[in-house]
Amino acid sequence: MKPFLSRSKTESDDKDEYNPIEDLVQTVKTIMEHFFTPEQYKELFGTASEGLHRSLTKYKNRKDGAQFLKAVEDFNQIMRKQKSLGAIQEHVRQYGHRLPYDLVVHLLQQVYSRTVAARASKLNQYEAFSNNVYGEILPILTKEFIQRTKMDESKVFVDLGCGIGNVVLQVALQTGAESYGVEIMDTPAKFAKKQAREFEARTRAFGLNHGAVSMIHGDFLDTPGLAGILARADVVLVNNYAFNSALNQSLLQLFLDLKEGCKIISLKTFVSLDHKINVRNAGSVESILRVKKYPYYTNAVSWTHNGGEYFIATVDRSAVQAFWERAMSDGGASLDDGGSRRSSTRRR
């Protein structure tokens, strides 16, 4: 690991500008915390108040380049020895596909800073109030999606309208799931592919496992091969916060062939929370979806600091089947009054 000195910064510089020195310090901290046991950390690097990371931070703050470089070389020597002993590889191997969240976020931030950050302003070039408005779901909310849907390495995940692919990469790395992203807009789609390439190289350098990643540039309503992928999907994400009703209705038709138990995460619901099955709507896609609403809190999405809500709809055809079985058992008498039956589950 070799630092390079950034240009001198003034007080007016953008605070969000990539800082390689800060990145190096945070990378060292991440490696110490997640590639070694607590006992190894203390033995090899010292304590948090007096150890090597403290030295790096101190010399960075003092702008003492010579001592900073010496601390980096001390770290590199330790790493070379531990790598030769196989200690690092052994510890990382124990994670399998259950990587710590902080490690995942740091690696994704490194990928972003090397592929997107310098050109991020291009992402704002879209038609306002259209279906192609750009916005990203942030890692903390993606983490919640993963927990709610119980994603793991046996699952298939599809992000319809994936933007620059951040969620796809996080799911692949944090869970090991086979992960797909589809994006229609040229600029985000190009960034998604660049991120995927950098992600592959960086995870390989760190020795980390991840699920297969595929970024597709195309319209999710008309992408060859997507129907086959969706038929295998266990979790589908649709950031439909800015979609109009026509596009949401078109999306519903894609969901008709999803397998039983597939979960659809969306920022706007595709079906009313009090949807009732009756003779008129029993054949609709809405009637096979069992939906629940969840809150999200501050700093969970890129387009607002405020909280909001999201929905998880589960494909469940049992309510429709029960409706028709009931109708057949009484010769259709129960349909005379509309024969409605509430399809969503109530929280207890």
Please give the residue ranges for each predicted region.
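Gly/Ala-rich phosphate-binding loop of Rossmann-like dinucleotide-binding domains
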Residues: 172-173, 193
